[in-house]
Design a protein with these regions (language model features):
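Switch/communication elements of ASCE P-loop NTPase nucleotide-binding domains
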Residues: 1-61, 236-378
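P-loop NTPase switch/coupling surface
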Residues: 1-180, 385, 415-439
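Amphipathic alpha-helical segments that form well-ordered structural scaffolds
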Residues: 46, 141, 211-219, 309, ...
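Solvent-exposed, amphipathic alpha-helical segments
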Residues: 50, 184-191, 271, 382-392
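A short, compositionally biased
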Residues: 76-85, 230-234, 333-335
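RecA-like P-loop NTPase motor core
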Residues: 129, 308, 312, 327-439
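A structural signal for short, well-ordered beta-strand segments and their strand-loop junctions
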Residues: 140-143, 225-230, 236, 321, ...
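Extended helical coiled-coil dimerization/tether regions that scaffold
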Residues: 170-284
Length: 439
């Protein structure tokens, strides 16, 4: 299951000029860029709304609905006629559309997600009939609040039994429900202990739990052996120090970056194992995962690697992420399609895959981020003064003296690239490619 196209009209800051993204089928990662207020989260919410009818066909799974506040209000303060989300999905070569609306000043047309709905119903009926080899796709949405979670203090209220489709519970809610994962992991550890006793094999490990452990082990390399202890109730892992010794830590004791990644990866792997427990490797489950601000609380070194890590651990998932970080773009250069929402409706193509993005400075100075220079803003006035003097038709003695002073002060900046140089380089590369010339 993957998203192939999404278009949005009259949603929040997106007005009557439809915003449409056609997704490259050769890429498993879509990176959304844009200034604050240009609709990165809006696009993610729209995708969540479009795909929600699929999990909503299963028992106990709520639909994901937008509110009246999501309908666009124009500059005159008038609400639009209605909000429209139009998406196209594909699953094993079968194309499915999902068109959803939200009422504004007029009644909406009838929504159309029958293909998506029927595909889900067919899966549900096959599971109930206990047919074999039925794979449930995964849908998940991790918002910016995913770092604010609480570990339950007691086992009270834990779910005792899990159906395969329970993998969809709270999945499209952008707030991470760590308690749900906690309850599932606790139950599976109990089952693993009972299976060890039944099999008379103290080395036995649950394949389902191993999927979660393996996912965490690959992405969070310095931490191993995730487990739940009951007195007091806590989720802990062992940190491997540089000297090889182990140090037990509760998840609450970890940095925000580690907490966010561990909670997200554990939740995602658990949902995959829950959805497809009979798969040889549940981490090969297909599906769509949305992550808002994927760089949240991550050190630049980890930002550079996180997309590669996620696609290696979950090879059949489609990740659609937003970011403000050029390091994320550099790290995902080979595997991701990059869409700049600032220019998506411009004549120029906003899909920047043909741009050579070999370093962070180049990305910052490209049209993806729009910085003019990499130096501190404190130099702007001096550069402006120099440019003003140079623009004069004739220079006085005082002008030449001041230019010499400015050149001395600015000489350390002359080696830094600027946006014009980057654009010139990109244009040369583009022309060379068109003319089949090797540079």
């Amino acid at each position: 299951m993957r998203l192939d196209r999404i278009s949005i009209t009259n949603m929040r800051l997106v007005g009557e000029d439809t915003r449409e993204i056609n997704i490259n089928p050769a890429k498993n990662v879509l990176i959304l860029l844009g200034d604050n207020g240009f609709g990165k989260t809006t696009v993610l919410d729209a995708i969540a709304t479009a795909m929600a009818p699929y999990p909503a066909q299963f028992p106990g799974i709520a639909d994901y609905q937008l509110s009246d506040l999501d309908v666009h209000i124009n500059r005159r303060g008038r609400r639009s006629k209605y909000l429209t989300i139009d998406a196209e999905f594909s699953d094993n070569g079968v194309s499915m559309t999902s068109v959803r609306y939200r009422k504004g000043t007029l009644n909406t047309p009838k929504p159309n997600y029958e293909q998506l709905k029927q595909a889900a119903i067919a899966k549900k009926e096959a599971i109930i009939a206990e047919e074999s080899n039925i794979e449930l796709p995964i849908f998940a949405y991790y918002g910016t609040g995913r770092g604010q979670f609480q570990v339950p203090e007691r086992r009270r209220g834990f779910q005792q039994t899990f159906e395969r489709w329970d993998c969809y519970k709270s999945a499209i809610n952008p707030e991470t429900d760590f308690k749900r994962f906690f309850g599932w992991f606790d139950m599976m550890e109990d089952q693993e202990r009972r299976d060890r006793e039944r099999l008379w094999d103290i080395t036995y490990k649950s394949p389902v739990l191993q999927a979660v452990r393996n996912a965490l082990g690959i992405i969070v390399k310095d931490y191993i052996n995730p487990r739940i202890e009951t007195r007091p109730l806590r989720f802990i892992m062992d940190r491997i120090d540089k000297d090889g010794s182990r140090h037990e830590l509760r998840i609450e004791q970890l940095s925000e970056g580690y907490k966010i990644v561990i909670a997200m990866v554990a939740d995602l792997a658990a949902r995959m194992a829950e959805a497809n427990p009979e798969m040889e490797n549940p981490l090969n489950t297909s599906g769509i995962v949305l992550i808002d601000e994927v760089d949240l609380h991550l050190h630049p070194r980890w930002q550079r690697e996180i997309l590669i890590q996620l696609t290696e651990v979950f090879p059949n998932l489609q990740f659609i992420v937003s970011t403000h970080s050029p390091v994320i773009v550099v790290g995902g250069a080979e595997i991701a399609q990059v869409v700049n929402l600032n220019t998506i409706n411009d004549d120029e193509n906003s899909h920047q895959n043909d741009i050579q993005i070999s370093n962070v400075g180049q990305v910052l100075l490209s049209d993806l981020f729009g910085l003019e220079y990499l130096y501190s803003p404190e130099w702007d006035d001096k550069i402006q003064e120099r440019d003003t003097i140079l623009a004069k038709p004739e220079l006085t003695v005082e002008d030449n003296t001041r230019l010499a002073e400015l050149d001395e002060e600015l000489k350390g900046l002359t080696s830094l690239p600027n946006s014009n140089a980057i654009r010139s380089s990109q244009l040369i590369e583009k022309l060379a490619k068109q003319l089949n010339i090797e540079l």
